[in-house]
Amino acid sequence: MPEKQDNKGFWNRYAKLYDFEIKQFSGKAYLEMYRMMGDYLSPDMTVLEVATGTGLIAVNIAAYVRHVEATDFSPKMIEAARRKKAPANIKFSVEDAAVLSFEDGLFDAVIISNALHIMPDPVKALANISRVLKPKGLLIAPSYSHGHISNSTWNLNAKFLKLIGFETFSKWTPDEYVAFIGQNGFQVKRLQVLRAAFPLVYLEAQKVE
């Protein structure tokens, strides 16, 4: 069986449109996410964001924490993020979720938003996230939900996206997503579905020792 290919080429091409698309289709949900993240983040925390894109989340949660390492595997996304007027406590860098370069137990919290379903190996990504989290560290992992729209609509959108170079490797209902996170070393603490063009499942979980 051929190895699954990642979406890096797509994201490199898409970097210039990323902020516009998020605002257009998920803007209100993202504003609610920032507020919800602020409920649990604190000024003493060092936070890693995986799949930061152009840094939208990092920029909006930086005031809640001590430091944010904001990473993405797309160099073009990181270039776009670095062009922003970002708070001084954010560092942007290119990193692959499957082979994170950070030392074990470094971060109080890890944020990975709308990314696990588009990764060829989300289990490996979660294992790396768990490795760099402190004991009982916080995982914040919002993800677009499959269960709130029809299979035909989802499949039609997926086919169109694949034609332009984007592939979805996993599709989960909210219950399936909770089960997936739980099977990979985390205990889900909070779950809420936010309205967006694709409904957004906001999830917080704690690393299980």
Regions found by a protein language model. Name each.
Residues M1-S42, L56, A80, K84, ...:
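Conserved class I S-adenosyl-L-methionine
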Residues P2-Q5, E21, I140-N184, K189-L194:
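C-terminal alpha-helical "lid/dimerization" subdomain adjacent to the S-adenosyl-L-methionine
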Residues M37, I61, I129:
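Class I S-adenosylmethionine-dependent transferase superfamily signal
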Residues M45, G137:
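Glycine-centered, small-residue-biased loops immediately flanking beta-strands
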Residues L48-V99:
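Class I SAM-dependent methyltransferase SAM/SAH-binding core
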Residues A98-A109:
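A short acidic, Gly/Pro-enriched loop at the edge of an enzyme's catalytic core
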Residues A109-P122:
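A short SAM/SAH-binding and catalytic strip from SAM-dependent methyltransferases
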Residues V123-P135:
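A short glycine-rich, Lys/Arg-flanked "PGG" loop and its adjoining helix->strand segment in the class I
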